[in-house]
């Protein structure tokens, strides 16, 4: 399966990264960052928008995807991040996976230098090394995908993330995965409307799982396949605090205008 291929490539990239900067050194650098910069809370950023009667938008910087290919030929991460910030984004998501999404850890570093919004590292995180690296790059939150991690790994990675002053956006696609996320201690859960095995999207996935998340009292985010104001209204009515949008923005001629239209 394609997902397995991405995971295999990612594991190899992490192995190569550890050869350049050993695990202990990356961890030390990350721990030093804790006292150097106060992290920004993704959860609080979303809830602040809700207090104004709006949904919190995590606007994504994404050059390509395995299913759609290149989404934006000329992508300047710093410019797009600044446009998102001016256009009402609550937070910025930066894809750092290089081979299939044409992202880069350097994108995150560059974005950190130009915006004061919370930044989410979006990647296939399989090893604590990547969490320490995210901290060093300037991330405030990391995406942890439930289906890629054993329960014990997920719990440990949430603990490491929070120990560094960051937050974990724990991604799920089914009731079973939501329960796994809750058991691991997730307080911020993202429902991916995209099936990572087929890449098909349907916001009904988020709508069906909303009651379980509401009952658990977590901050709720809906990810992928959100294209219209009607979609946003349905998700807000269901109780979602935030939405993650990438493709609909980066494919637009003017990403900032596209975001403003969705939020109007």
Curated annotation (Swiss-Prot):
<keyword id="KW-0057">Aromatic amino acid biosynthesis</keyword>
<dbReference type="GO" id="GO:0004640">
    <property type="term" value="F:phosphoribosylanthranilate isomerase activity"/>
</dbReference>
<dbReference type="InterPro" id="IPR045186">
    <property type="entry name" value="Indole-3-glycerol_P_synth"/>
</dbReference>
<protein>
    <recommendedName>
        <fullName>Indole-3-glycerol phosphate synthase</fullName>
        <ecNumber>4.1.1.48</ecNumber>
    </recommendedName>
</protein>
<keyword id="KW-0456">Lyase</keyword>
<dbReference type="GO" id="GO:0004425">
    <property type="term" value="F:indole-3-glycerol-phosphate synthase activity"/>
</dbReference>
<keyword id="KW-0210">Decarboxylase</keyword>
<dbReference type="GO" id="GO:0000162">
    <property type="term" value="P:L-tryptophan biosynthetic process"/>
</dbReference>
<dbReference type="InterPro" id="IPR011060">
    <property type="entry name" value="RibuloseP-bd_barrel"/>
</dbReference>
<dbReference type="InterPro" id="IPR013785">
    <property type="entry name" value="Aldolase_TIM"/>
</dbReference>
<keyword id="KW-0822">Tryptophan biosynthesis</keyword>
<comment type="pathway">
    <text>Amino-acid biosynthesis; L-tryptophan biosynthesis; L-tryptophan from chorismate: step 4/5.</text>
</comment>
<keyword id="KW-0028">Amino-acid biosynthesis</keyword>
<dbReference type="Pfam" id="PF00218">
    <property type="entry name" value="IGPS"/>
</dbReference>
<dbReference type="InterPro" id="IPR001468">
    <property type="entry name" value="Indole-3-GlycerolPSynthase_CS"/>
</dbReference>
<comment type="similarity">
    <text>Belongs to the TrpC family.</text>
</comment>
<dbReference type="InterPro" id="IPR013798">
    <property type="entry name" value="Indole-3-glycerol_P_synth_dom"/>
</dbReference>
């Amino acid at each position: 399966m394609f997902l397995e291929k991405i995971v295999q490539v990612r594991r190899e990239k992490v192995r190569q990264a550890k050869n350049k900067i050993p695990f202990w050194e990356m961890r030390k650098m990350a721990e030093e960052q804790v006292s150097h910069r106060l992290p920004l809370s993704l959860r609080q950023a979303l809830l602040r928008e809700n207090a104004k009667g709006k949904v919190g938008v995590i606007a994504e910087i994404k050059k390509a995807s395995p299913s759609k290919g290149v989404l934006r030929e000329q992508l300047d991460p710093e410019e797009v991040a600044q446009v998102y910030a001016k256009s009402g984004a609550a937070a910025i998501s930066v894809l750092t996976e290089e081979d299939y999404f044409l992202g880069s850890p350097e994108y995150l570093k560059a974005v950190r230098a130009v915006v004061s919004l919370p930044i989410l590292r979006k990647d296939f995180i399989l090893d604590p090394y990547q969490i320490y690296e995210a901290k060093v790059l300037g991330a405030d939150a990391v995406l942890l995908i439930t289906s890629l991690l054993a329960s014990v790994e997920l719990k440990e990675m949430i603990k490491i993330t929070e120990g560094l002053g960051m937050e974990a956006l724990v991604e799920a696609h089914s009731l079973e995965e939501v329960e796994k996320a809750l058991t691991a201690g997730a307080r911020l859960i993202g429902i991916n409307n995209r099936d990572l095995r087929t890449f098909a999207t349907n916001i009904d996935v988020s709508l069906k799982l909303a009651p379980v998340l509401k009952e658990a009292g977590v901050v709720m985010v809906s990810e992928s396949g959100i294209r219209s104001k009607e979609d946003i209204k349905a998700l807000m009515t269901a109780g979602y605090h935030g939405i993650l949008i990438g493709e609909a923005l980066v494919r637009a001629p003017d990403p900032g205008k596209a975001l403003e239209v969705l939020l109007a």
